[in-house]
Regions:
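N-terminal export leaders
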Residues: 12-30
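N-terminal secretory signal peptides
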Residues: 1-12
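Phosphate-binding glycine-rich loop
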Residues: 89-130, 144, 154, 221
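PLP-dependent aminotransferase-like
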Residues: 45, 121-210, 217
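Conserved active-site segment immediately N-terminal to the catalytic lysine
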Residues: 208-242, 247
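Conserved SAM-binding loop
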Residues: 108, 133, 248
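C-terminal segment of N-terminal export signals and the immediately downstream linker at the start
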Residues: 32-87, 95, 99
Length: 251
């Protein structure tokens, strides 16, 4: 009897059957994939395409304008100019900020960067000491360290809050680490209770960047009062703007 070889390719009838069966199964699992019509490509609005949101430009500018000053602020500025006593208001501001935060020692600065530099000077660490900072941070927190030969250790940020990730800090702790320097991104408080516990356990100084966190609090305790030292900024983009200014705070 003559031996016949099997065909390596399925017959046309079998191929059509398999294709039809596969499409039927795909249709059961993903009916929208079969029934959906292809969408026409659209250009982005910036490239001349249709806008997804329509909002009057004048209203948008009014809503997003910052900083905002009212008549009270304008009157206070006029009084300052008329009296020609430019520096008399500063001690009053320090006194009011001290009463608001409950911090015993503080000093106003020309800006937040100056307050940060003063804070890093005050801790008086040895050159080469490591300070943990979030990887998403304002440059001054790191740049000011170079004045004192401190070494920044960049800590990952939490994907849910955008703030200092304590678990990553635990992994990157070394024998040279001397301080942690968390920042409250966009005013979102870091987990300062856990950070303080970690710092106490490892004998670390807590430096708190509260530049964005005016008025924010956690567990009834204001941000800027959790650290051994802390700073605020009053730059024009901040929650409490004075065009420029900063505050250094010390327990």
């Amino acid at each position: 009897m003559e031996n016949k070889k099997f065909e390596e390719k399925p017959s046309e009838g079998r191929r059509n059957f398999l294709q039809a069966g596969g499409m039927a199964l795909l249709g059961l699992a993903m009916p929208e994939a079969i029934s959906a019509k292809p969408r026409a490509a659209e250009s982005l609005a910036m490239s001349g395409g249709p806008k997804a949101v329509h909002f009057p430009a004048d209203k948008l500018e009014a809503l997003t304008r910052w900083p905002r000053y009212g008549q009270a602020e304008k009157d206070a500025l006029h009084r300052l100019i008329d009296t020609d006593m430019f520096y008399e208001e500063l001690p009053l501001f320090e006194k009011e900020w001290q009463a608001y935060t409950g911090i015993p020692y503080l000093r106003a600065h020309i800006n937040g960067s100056s307050a940060i530099t003063s804070m890093l000077f005050a801790i008086d660490l040895e050159p080469g000491s490591e300070i943990m900072v979030p990887s998403y941070d304002f440059p001054t927190d790191v740049l000011a360290m170079r004045f004192f030969s401190y070494v920044p250790i960049f800590i990952d940020i939490s994907p849910t809050t955008g703030t200092f990730d304590l678990e990553d800090a635990r992994r990157k702790m070394t024998s040279r680490t001397r301080a942690v320097f968390p920042m409250h991104s966009w005013g979102m408080p870091c987990d300062m209770d856990h950070i303080r516990d970690f710092a106490k356990e490892k004998d670390l100084i807590v430096l708190e960047d509260a530049a964005h966190a005016h008025g924010a609090s956690m567990q009834g305790k204001k941000m800027g009062t959790w650290g051994d030292l802390a700073i605020f900024s009053f730059q024009a983009s901040k929650v409490l703007p004075t065009v420029e200014g900063g505050m250094g705070m010390y327990h």
